[in-house]
């Protein structure tokens, strides 16, 4: 897979349930030691079943395995309240914007991956 999400520094992870695609998440490098999580998506019929949490945990594990020290993301808080709660529950904290996002209510978050 070419592009930002290609190995060795990027990843595209898929979640399946009974052979059906349930969701996805991707990682790509931002700068040395820092990755960005993108495209965390769970299909509507698989929501509230732990798929999003499983994808987030898999993305965190992959980022650590690659050697990233921090993970960043941006989201839209008014629309993605459940996702924002999940990110906060996993230790993400709000940071200043690190790139432009034209959406109103954009929220930027970061997690230290080194424990």
PLM feature spans:
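Alpha-helical macromolecular-interaction surfaces
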Residues: 50, 54, 58, 81-82
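Conserved GNAT acetyl-CoA-binding A-motif
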Residues: 63-75
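Glycine-rich ATP-binding loop(s) of histidine-kinase-like ATPases
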Residues: 47
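Conserved acetyl-CoA-binding loop of GNAT-fold acetyltransferases
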Residues: 87-96
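Acetyl-CoA-dependent GNAT
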Residues: 1-38, 43-44, 56-58, 62, ...
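Conserved G/P- and acidic residue-centered "switch" motifs that form tight phosphate/ATP-binding loops
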Residues: 19, 50-52, 67
């Amino acid at each position: 897979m070419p592009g930002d999400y290609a190995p060795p520094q990027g990843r595209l992870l898929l979640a399946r349930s009974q052979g059906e695609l349930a969701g996805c998440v991707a990682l790509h490098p931002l700068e040395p030691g820092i990755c960005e999580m993108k495209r965390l998506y769970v299909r509507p019929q698989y929501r509230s079943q732990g798929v999003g949490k499983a994808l987030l945990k898999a993305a965190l594990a992959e980022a650590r395995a690659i050697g990233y020290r921090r993970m960043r993301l941006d989201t839209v808080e008014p629309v993605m309240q459940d996702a924002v709660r999940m990110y906060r529950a996993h230790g993400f904290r709000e940071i200043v914007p690190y790139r432009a996002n034209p959406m109103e209510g954009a929220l930027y978050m970061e997690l230290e991956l080194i424990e």
